[in-house]
Amino acid sequence: MKLPNKLGPIHFIGIGGIGMSGIAEVMHNLGYTVQGSDAADNYNVKRLAEKGIRTFVGHRAENLAEAELVVVSTAIRRDNPELAMARERRLPVVRRAEMLAELMRFKSCVAVAGTHGKTTTTSLVATLLDAGGLDPTVINGGIINAYGTNARMGEGEWMVVEADESDGTFLKLPADIAIVTNIDPEHLDHFGSFDAIKDAFRAFIDNIPFYGFAVMCIDHPTVQDLVGRIEDRRIITYGENPQADVRLIDVDLRGGQSRFRVMIRDRRPGFRLEMEDLVLPMPGKHNALNATAALAVAHELGVAPEAIRRALAGFGGVKRRFTRTGEWNGAQIFDDYGHHPVEIKAVLKAARASTEGNVVAVVQPHRYTRLASLFDDFCTCFNDADTVIVAPVYAAGEAPIEGFDRDTLVAGLKSRGHRNAVALERSEDLAGLVNGLVGPGDYVVCLGAGNITQWAYALPGELSALGEKAA
């Protein structure tokens, strides 16, 4: 039995969240009556309202109105007034991942998992399948610039979704094809241990049907170890590793883009295909690897090499993934969602390869628990930045943890040899700090999952205003 075509109004609590908004948009496009509320009138709420979806700012019991089904994210507390009213009325309440799983049953599905790179890889898979005429439905964890949204309703057989492992609910997703980009210690507040995270990813792969397959990056040692423990499922490996089935070769990261070639070797004796002169207009080896994963899926689904080449070259990127927000005095300012040490290191490495100038990193640590559990990694992931400006921790509702804050991170960076790490007292002081640091050819990279994105977009104008005052 699949999701009925006729359901009463479906109410999303937290509809402005990136995952919730995508599901709501697709369900609206399928003809369901959708409504929802969020604490803030953010970009996603406004976008959904423009599409004709009824939205409410603030959570109140009366918002449910005639709703017959309620969808909630894991961020919603049990004492939320709308959730309490739904339970008082004995309405069905489903988690975000459960509703996504129901939507996936309408299509054949590619699910993209991994600690890092999910959103970009999901976008790349969607772009390549679209270029191959497969017209996929897409539900992503970030805004795909070419679509202006994180969700797209296609007419084709395939759906491409980002599989969020943060609360373990990605195990509910019925994928035919799975991608695993990497596996690192993250979301330990939910899983409790790294071993539990690895077990969850193994279960994710084991859930694939016998006629499906998994695409896994064996450049990452934990993923390579997992490949060795998977039985009875078809695995396609990718990476720079010489043993990879789909091998990334000759990566050139100069000029703010990635040039590379890919060699595909099937387990069939003698089968070999080389794709040369591939260009992705995004910097960083991590993005070249993401593109290689997407290429592996597209090739398996019959997308022609020339269509893959054109689609990669025209890829418009994803919002908050090395997104250029402006320029001042010849220096480029970027916004990036990177908030885990592995992500920060990859982004700064990409920035370093893309410019001959200086790289200034502005970081807003996200959550005290993350800073505490990965503190040593945070202290050593900024080596490619000439200067690190550290803002106060974005708490995301957490209580402070003694010994893990902005100042201890600055001290930790310095004690491990970084030559220029400074504390930012207030966001209003950022332009003044940056003003004395950058010139033509330099990069300023704003990093974090909090509200630092607003600073990144405001910074070019604030720097210009400072310059006008000085004149």
From Swiss-Prot:
GO terms for molecular function: ATP binding; UDP-N-acetylmuramate-L-alanine ligase activity. Signal peptide: none annotated. One of its GO terms (biological process) is cell division. Pathway: Cell wall biogenesis; peptidoglycan biosynthesis. Its EC number is 6.3.2.8. It catalyses: UDP-N-acetyl-alpha-D-muramate + L-alanine + ATP = UDP-N-acetyl-alpha-D-muramoyl-L-alanine + ADP + phosphate + H(+). ATP binds at residues 114-120. One of its GO terms (cellular component) is cytoplasm. Keywords: ATP-binding, Cell cycle, Cell division, Cell shape, Cell wall biogenesis/degradation, Cytoplasm, Ligase, Nucleotide-binding, Peptidoglycan synthesis. The keyword Nucleotide-binding applies. The keyword Ribosomal protein does not apply. It is found in: Cytoplasm. It comes from the Bacteria. SUPFAM superfamilies: MurCD N-terminal domain, MurD-like peptide ligases, catalytic domain, MurD-like peptide ligases, peptide-binding domain. PANTHER family: UDP-N-ACETYLMURAMATE--L-ALANINE LIGASE, UDP-N-ACETYLMURAMATE--L-ALANINE LIGASE-RELATED. Belongs to the MurCDEF family. HAMAP family: MurC. Cell wall formation. This is UDP-N-acetylmuramate--L-alanine ligase.
